[in-house]
Amino acid sequence: MANVHVINHPLVQHKLTIIRDKNTGTKAFRELVDEVATLMAYEITRDMELEDIQVETPLQTTTAKTLTGKKLGIVPILRAGLGMQDGILKLIPAAKVGHVGLYRDHDTLEPVEYFVKLPSDVEERLFIVVDPMLATGGSAIMAIDCLKKRGARNMKFMCLVAAPEGVKALQDAHPDVEIYVAGLDEKLDENGYIRPGLGDAGDRLFGTK
């Protein structure tokens, strides 16, 4: 699929297996999601631009590389996206953080927006929109819609697991947004859940039912 990057790093895949396991408790689940987010952030930032600068080492002046180009922003989709936020910030501590609050209506399976708060300089940033799961694609599409309406022009989407239906929906709605996923799963079931999936990420992160 165009613009879809499956992160097959052995550590990502190993940790994702434990995340999927129904016997993994809240504490371990939360820690593993955080760790996988850090590892995936390493991949999603691989194409960041560099420029040469002069730096003084203890021994001499030399040419070295430093980041340039667009500043970064992280936008977790509430609430489950919060579980990936700190893992990315460990790697990119200077990134600004916005939030988009959505919940899925369990009757219509459609997302409903209830909160949006973004940095003021949205036009200048590359945003990494994060949510552990890409199921129908509705929440990701609405979150990216929210950013674009407020002036954002550069975005990537990152999730742990995705259904093919959600990937296609997001690609159709936002073909300019690259998708980074740890596990591309089989399908959505009749209830709109990813199979085999990992259960309800929000409930497993926060210990709720």
From Swiss-Prot:
Which biological process annotations from GO are given for this protein? UMP salvage; uracil salvage
Say which domain of life the source belongs to: Bacteria
Q: Does the keyword Repressor apply?
A: no
The record's Gene3D superfamilies line, in alphabetical order, gives: 3.40.50.2020
What does the sequence similarity comment in the record state about its family?
Belongs to the UPRTase family.
Name any cofactors this protein relies on. Answer: Mg(2+)
What gene name does this entry carry? upp
Locate the residues binding 5-phospho-alpha-D-ribose 1-diphosphate: 79, 104, 131-139, 200
EC numbers, comma separated: 2.4.2.9
Q: Does the keyword Repeat apply?
A: no
Function, as annotated, reads: Catalyzes the conversion of uracil and 5-phospho-alpha-D-ribose 1-diphosphate (PRPP) to UMP and diphosphate.
Which CDD domains does the entry mention?
PRTases_typeI (cd06223)
Q: HAMAP family, from UniProt?
A: Upp_B
Entry binding sites for uracil = 194, 199-201
Q: Do you know which NCBIfam families this protein is assigned to?
A: PRK00129.1 (NF001097), upp (TIGR01091)
Task: Report the protein name in the record.
Answer: Uracil phosphoribosyltransferase
